[in-house]
Structures are given as structure tokens and as C-alpha cells.
Amino acid sequence: MLLLAGLGNPGPQYQNHRHNVGFMAADAIFRRHSFSPWSKKFSALVAEGRVGTEKLLLVKPQTFMNLSGQAVGEAMRFYKLQPSDIIVFYDELDLAPGKVRVKRGSGSGGHNGIKSIDAHCGQDYRRVRIGIGHPGDKARVTPHVLGDFAKADHAWLDPLLDAMAENVDLLITGDESGFMNKASLAVQGKAADIEMAGEKPAQKGRSHIRQARPKAPPAELPSSGPMAAMLKKLFGGKE
């Protein structure tokens, strides 16, 4: 059995927050594959199912983000699982919107839900980091993370969630590169480019550096002297 945990905050007021994209991933997997109805257990919503030959337990902690490890740890111990049997889906500020990266172990990157799981389960589990982008200013991080996805975001978010759900078999069988590739293809050309504030886009085919250079004035040809005589011989001239 593998335990797939999606992180977020419980309650309808949080359901569209960027911080809840882990819940959204779990919901997409639930819809795409055959699972039992959600039930309350381990301070979480849980559903059992199977993808291919692998039995799965979907977990959505209902403890609020900062205590996610309580629910995941309790489920891990109940089913006598190891940290290596756990896959966690969560939001990542330091990835551009629509980017997905899978890694095993390492630090929390400042994510409180991951800190909590590290404390209760150790660090040797796989993390599916789902990019939500950084607002660019530290003071805007909290309202960004705890804000709803914009309507325009669904152009990349919906196909991304669908692709992760459809290809979760690649993830559970260890083909992490294949899973990330499918996720990348799903959002190709759909995630909006983020322009630097106040910077106008370059004209097609010209770099910003090239545009910044002033045009050099045309060279003036000498009208008298030896050089003028030589040029006149080479190119001719009006008499």
C-alpha cells in the first residue's frame, strides 16, 4: 500500500486557495480512479482504492496545514507503512505556476505542512511540489498563498490536475521523470508569462540589450584630402 496525502486547510472558505492545491490534486486522483467514498479517520478524510495492482490510501488532513503530520503520521503507523511508502502533494512558492517537481527527502523549504510531516514521519518520503509562483515581494507572500486562484489560472491548473490524476500510475511505479513530463506537456503554452514590473516586452526578434543601444550616426565621408581622392577613384563621383 502507498499513502498519497494532499495538503491544504479544511473548510469551504479555503477550498480555492493556492495553499490548497494539494487537496485539489487528491480530489482529482479520487475522481479519476476507483476509490471508496471519503470517510473520517486519523483526523483526516481518507479513501481507499487501487491503481493498477497498487493499493492506495488517499489522505486529506483536516487538522489545518501546520498540523498535517499528525494525520499522516497516524495513518502511516496504523497501516504499518514506512516513510518511503508516502507521497505528499503540496504547493510550492519557489516554482513557477504549473511547474511540477518530484523529490525524495531534503528540507521543508519553509512549508509548514511539510515541517509537520517531517516531524511525525521523518524525511524519507516523496514530495510532489506543485508550483504556484512567488509574488515577488515577501510582504505579499501570505495573501498570495492564502488567496484564491485567479480565473485565468484555471487555463493551466485544470489540465495540470487532470494530467497528474491520469498519470499517477507513473508516479506510484517510480517513473517520476515520466510523471513530470506528462504534467509539463499538459500545461505547455498555457501558463501565463510573468513580465518584470515596468518592463516593456522586447520587439519580436530583438533583445532588450539591442534595443537599449542608441543608433550610431552615419559615418561622414571626407570631402577633401588624400582619402577623398582615393574614394573618388574607387567609387566615382560627380565632376
Swiss-Prot record:
One GO MF term: peptidyl-tRNA hydrolase activity
Chain intervals for the UniProt region annotation (Disordered): 199-227
Marked site (Stabilizes the basic form of H active site to accept a proton) residue numbers: D91
Highest taxon in the source lineage: Bacteria
SUPFAM superfamilies: Peptidyl-tRNA hydrolase-like (SSF53178)
UniProt cross-references to InterPro entries, sorted A to Z: Pept_tRNA_hydro, Pept_tRNA_hydro_CS, Pept_tRNA_hydro_sf
Keyword vocabulary terms for this entry: Cytoplasm, Hydrolase, RNA-binding, tRNA-binding
E.C. number: 3.1.1.29
Keyword Ion transport: no
Main location: cytoplasm
UniProt key word Secreted: no
Catalytic activity: an N-acyl-L-alpha-aminoacyl-tRNA + H2O = an N-acyl-L-amino acid + a tRNA + H(+)
Site residues (Discriminates between blocked and unblocked aminoacyl-tRNA), renumbered to this chain: N9
Regions of compositional bias (Basic residues) in chain numbering: 203-213
Cystines in this chain: none
Localisation: Cytoplasm
List of catalytic residues: H19
Chain positions recorded as tRNA binding sites: Y14, F64, N66, N112
GO BP annotations, alphabetical order: protein quality control for misfolded or incompletely synthesized proteins; rescue of stalled ribosome
One GO CC annotation: cytoplasm
Quaternary data: Monomer.
PANTHER family, per the entry: PEPTIDYL-TRNA HYDROLASE
Similarity comment text for this entry: Belongs to the PTH family.
UniProt function note: Hydrolyzes ribosome-free peptidyl-tRNAs (with 1 or more amino acids incorporated), which drop off the ribosome during protein synthesis, or as a result of ribosome stalling. Catalyzes the release of premature peptidyl moieties from peptidyl-tRNA molecules trapped in stalled 50S ribosomal subunits, and thus maintains levels of free tRNAs and 50S ribosomes.
Protein name as catalogued: Peptidyl-tRNA hydrolase
Species of origin: Chelativorans sp. (strain BNC1)
Upper lineage: Bacteria, Pseudomonadati, Pseudomonadota, Alphaproteobacteria, Hyphomicrobiales
Gene: pth
